[in-house]
Design a protein with these regions (language model features):
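Short, Lys/Arg-enriched N-terminal segments with co-localized hydrophobic residues
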Residues: 1-7
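C-terminal cap/substrate-recognition subdomain and adjoining C-terminal extension
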Residues: 72-183
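A structure-centric signal for secondary-structure junctions around beta-strands
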Residues: 7-8, 120
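Alpha-helical substrate-recognition element adjacent to the catalytic core
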Residues: 9-99
C-alpha cells in the first residue's frame, strides 16, 4: 500500500514583533494582526507552525498550552479566526566550546522541522528578525532561510509601521510561490 503525501503551505510564525509590538501590544492590537494572519492563511491555504521563543509554552506532542501563558489568548484568537496551528519548531541546542550550550538559531530549527515534514512544499517565515534589528549583530538567526522571510518591525519611530500589516500579504504570496529546497 502506498502512502499519500499531502502537500501543504506553512507559515513559520514569531509572536513578538509580528502580533505584538513595542507601541501596540494590547489584546485588540494583537487581534487586529491575527485577522490579517487569518486572511493570509485562508487565501493561500496555509497552516501555522510556531517558531517564536515563547513556543516552549506549547507541548510538542499534544499542542496543549501551559496554564497562565499569554500564548493561550493568542491560540483562542487563532481558533476564533480559523487559523490552524499544526506544531512548533523543535528545540535544538548547539555546543560551543567545551561546556557552553546555546539554543540553535531559528533557521536551524526551521530547517530541522522541514526535514521532519516533507509534506511542507511551500513555506514563509513571518518574523521581525530581532537578532539583527535589536541586537545589532552582523548576522541574523534567519540568514539561511532569508529568501522565505517576510520581515516585520517590532519598534519604529512611526508606530504604524510595526507588526504584521496588510502590505505583508502580497510579500507572503510571492514567497509561497517558491518551492522549498529539499534539505
Amino acid at each position: 500500500m502506498c502512502k499519500v503525501l499531502i502537500i501543504m503551505n506553512v507559515i513559520f510564525l514569531d509572536y513578538e514583533g509580528v502580533l505584538d509590538t513595542f507601541h501596540f501590544n494590547s489584546l485588540e492590537d494583537i487581534e487586529r494582526r491575527i485577522k490579517i494572519l487569518a486572511s493570509i492563511c485562508k487565501d493561500y491555504d496555509c497552516k501555522v507552525v510556531i517558531e517564536a521563543s515563547e513556543k516552549n509554552a506549547i507541548d510538542e506532542e499534544t499542542m496543549e498550552i501551559a496554564d497562565g501563558s499569554w500564548v493561550n489568548k493568542i491560540f483562542e484568537l487563532f481558533k476564533k479566526y480559523g487559523i490552524e496551528c499544526i506544531g512548533r519548531t523543535p528545540n535544538i541546542e548547539k555546543k560551543i566550546g567545551e561546556y557552553t550550550y546555546l539554543p540553535m538559531w531559528k533557521e536551524d530549527e526551521i530547517i530541522e522541522y522541514l526535514k521532519m515534514h516533507p509534506e511542507v512544499e511551500h513555506y514563509c517565515i513571518i518574523d521581525d528578525d530581532d537578532t539583527k534589528a535589536i541586537m545589532h549583530w552582523e548576522v541574523s538567526d534567519l540568514d539561511k532561510v532569508r529568501e522565505h522571510l517576510v520581515e516585520t518591525i517590532y519598534y519604529s519611530n512611526n508606530p504604524n509601521e510595526e507588526g504584521l500589516l496588510p502590505k505583508h500579504k502580497s510579500e507572503v504570496a510571492k514567497i509561497l510561490k517558491k518551492r522549498r529546497q529539499y534539505l
